[in-house]
């Protein structure tokens, strides 16, 4: 959201976004199912329109509003992992330990989004946001890494695919189509991933 953006109307931006989601999922040509449940630890009643949406904001300079939408199933969330590693622990080793445990529930081949640093919450958000970037691992392979995050991307892409998990966990050469890594400064005592 640009700092100079003015939104007209009597609704909050969240309410406007949720109205857009509601209209999209209730549109006669929509082929995506409604999967959001209210009262998740109680009645688990389907909202029938996938609202309320999970909304994250970044306030940036400018006068434009950009909205990225990710309509996704539950597998990507169900297989999410978080760890507060020791600063000396290897992110590569941790990822290579976690991916085989995920089974086929994340519907490979897919993309891995890895957030490193900040706080627990920030690391998870970095991972999710990184998945909005285009698949470009082959371009990165061609030009070579320019920083530690890109080195991690290349190393994990090679090593995760070498696990042989393959499509739908049935074995094969391609488990990930790309690996995204985003990092953020963190406290010296921690390495949230």
Describe the residue ranges of each PLM region.
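Gly/Ser/Thr-rich active-site loops/lids in small-molecule metabolic enzymes
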Residues: 13-17, 21, 88-94, 123-153
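A generic, well-ordered mixed alpha/beta core segment in the N-terminal half of proteins
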Residues: 1-61, 68-70
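Structural signal for hydrophobic packing residues in well-ordered secondary-structure cores
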Residues: 17-29, 59, 71, 95-106, ...
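C-terminal edge-of-domain segments
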Residues: 59-69, 172-193
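Conserved phosphate/anionic-ligand binding catalytic regions in large, soluble enzymes, centered on
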Residues: 1-7, 105-125, 185-193
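Active-site-proximal helix-loop elements at catalytic-domain edges
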Residues: 62-91, 156-157
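Active-site glycine-rich loop that binds ribose-phosphate moieties when present
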Residues: 49-53, 84-101
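Flexible, glycine/charged-enriched surface loops at secondary-structure junctions
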Residues: 26-39, 101-113, 138-149, 163-178
């Amino acid at each position: 959201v640009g700092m100079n953006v003015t939104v007209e109307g009597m609704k909050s931006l969240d309410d406007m976004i949720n109205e857009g989601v509601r209209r999209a999922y209730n549109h006669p040509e929509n082929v995506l199912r409604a999967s959001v449940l209210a009262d998740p630890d109680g009645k688990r009643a389907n909202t029938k329109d996938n609202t309320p949406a999970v909304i994250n904001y970044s306030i940036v300079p400018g006068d434009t509003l950009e909205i990225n939408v990710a309509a996704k199933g539950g597998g990507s969330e169900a297989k999410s992992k978080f760890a507060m590693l020791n600063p000396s622990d290897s992110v590569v080793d941790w990822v290579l330990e976690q991916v085989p445990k995920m089974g086929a529930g994340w519907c490979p081949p897919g993309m891995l989004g890895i957030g490193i640093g900040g706080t627990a919450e920030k690391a998870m958000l970095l991972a999710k946001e990184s998945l909005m970037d285009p698949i470009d691992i082959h371009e990165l392979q061609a030009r070579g890494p320019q920083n530690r995050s890109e080195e991690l991307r290349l190393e994990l892409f090679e090593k995760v695919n070498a696990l042989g998990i393959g499509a739908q966990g049935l074995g094969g050469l391609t488990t990930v189509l790309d690996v995204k890594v985003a990092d953020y400064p963190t406290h010296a005592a921690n390495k949230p991933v």
